[in-house]
């Protein structure tokens, strides 16, 4: 409110350097946007610049690029870039590869010390989870990505905190402790809200299911944890799968880690099946489509079983309640809790 954006872009064709740029006017004071000084560090001819969600979308002579502030480590960037290099040598995937600046660096700094990255981007729409064909196209690409990631040998230098994550059994154990803590808080309240009464009414059923899933997954990880660990995307959902005319792009690898690839498949399948009222036909089609590219072993299917068994949506609702304003819970959250009980 009270902010007006003015876009003025000029070029030096000989050097492909952005000269002047976007102005942000606040209270009559003009502040030059940082993206101009950052883009001038790249061998790119800028044709157009527009704001995206938390980033700048840049039309260039080398295609669409995305400019975003970066707050991670250089080691993390190097890890992702090395993986992209190996993927491209074997597969030529549609991914959001980082662009190096004139100095050959992945990171560029603005005068105020902020650090920025530029990467390849796609103007195509996100995967529509309500469209079976798009869902199965996405599954094909997920399987292809997983197959190629399995060929990449994990390097000792990649042993970073963001790459070595909790196994799902340990994560379930932590979530169960959070469920117990929230239930104890609710039971000790004298006057309970409708949401809290709903939790008291169905907690035992969901918690027993959570315990069974945790026990099964812990045993699974104890026997198969090491042998089932490969590089995973880490955040696969419809927002990170873009439907290009000739292929399917997978973007935002900032949570890529060493773990169980079935977690990637589970998260995407769950999102899709929720949109289709848990259609068994669609679920089987997704598994068959994945298996045509990367056959699912009995071990993979066991892992998927325990992931689906865990009442993740229930935990999310309870955890949201416990960490938010407990005095007021939106009616929609109460409906979600009741819907979860009906789906059992």
Language-model segments: which ranges?
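Regulatory N- and C-terminal appendages and interdomain linkers associated
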Residues: 4, 26-45, 205-208, 334-344
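ATP-binding glycine-rich phosphate-binding loop
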Residues: 37-59
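ATP/Mg2+ or Mg2+-diphosphate-binding catalytic cores
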Residues: 315-344
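ATP-binding pocket architecture of kinase catalytic cores
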Residues: 63-157
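ATP-dependent phospho-/nucleotidyl transfer catalytic cores
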Residues: 48, 68-75, 157-231, 285
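Active-site acidic catalytic loop and adjacent metal/ATP-binding pocket
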Residues: 57, 98, 214-263
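A glycine-centered beta->alpha junction motif in the catalytic cores
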Residues: 116-129, 181-188, 310-326
């Amino acid at each position: 409110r009270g902010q007006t954006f003015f876009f003025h872009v000029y070029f030096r064709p000989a050097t492909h350097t952005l000269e002047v740029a976007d102005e942000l006017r606040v209270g009559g004071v003009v502040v030059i946007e940082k993206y101009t000084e950052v883009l001038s560090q790249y061998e790119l001819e800028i044709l157009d610049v527009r704001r995206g969600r938390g980033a700048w979308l840049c039309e260039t002579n080398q295609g669409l690029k995305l400019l975003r502030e970066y707050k991670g480590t250089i080691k993390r960037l190097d890890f992702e870039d090395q993986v992209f290099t190996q993927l491209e040598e074997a597969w030529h995937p549609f991914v959001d590869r980082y662009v190096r600046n004139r100095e050959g660096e992945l990171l560029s700094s603005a005068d105020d010390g902020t650090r920025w990255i530029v990467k390849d981007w796609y103007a195509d729409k996100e995967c529509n989870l309500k469209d079976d064909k798009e869902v199965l196209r996405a599954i094909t690409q997920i399987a292809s990505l997983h197959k190629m990631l399995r060929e990449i040998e994990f390097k000792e230098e990649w042993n970073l905190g963001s790459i070595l994550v909790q196994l799902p059994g340990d994560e379930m154990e932590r979530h169960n402790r959070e469920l117990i803590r929230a239930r104890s808080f609710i039971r000790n309240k004298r006057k309970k809200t409708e949401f809290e009464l709903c939790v008291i009414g169905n907690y035992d059923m969901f918690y027993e299911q959570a315990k069974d899933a945790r026990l099964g997954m812990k045993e699974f990880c104890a026997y198969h944890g090491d042998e089932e660990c490969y590089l995973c995307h880490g955040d696969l959902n419809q927002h990170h799968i873009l439907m290009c005319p000739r292929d399917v792009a997978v973007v935002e690898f900032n949570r890529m880690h060493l773990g169980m690839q079935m977690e990637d498949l589970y998260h995407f399948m769950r999102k899709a099946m929720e949109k289709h009222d848990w259609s068994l036909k669609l679920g089987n089609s997704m598994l068959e489509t994945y298996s045509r590219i990367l056959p699912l072993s009995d071990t993979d299917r066991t892992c998927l079983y325990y992931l689906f068994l865990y009442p993740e949506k229930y935990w999310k609702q309870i955890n949201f309640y416990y960490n938010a304003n407990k005095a007021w819970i939106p009616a929609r959250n109460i409906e979600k809790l009741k819907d979860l009980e009906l789906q059992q």
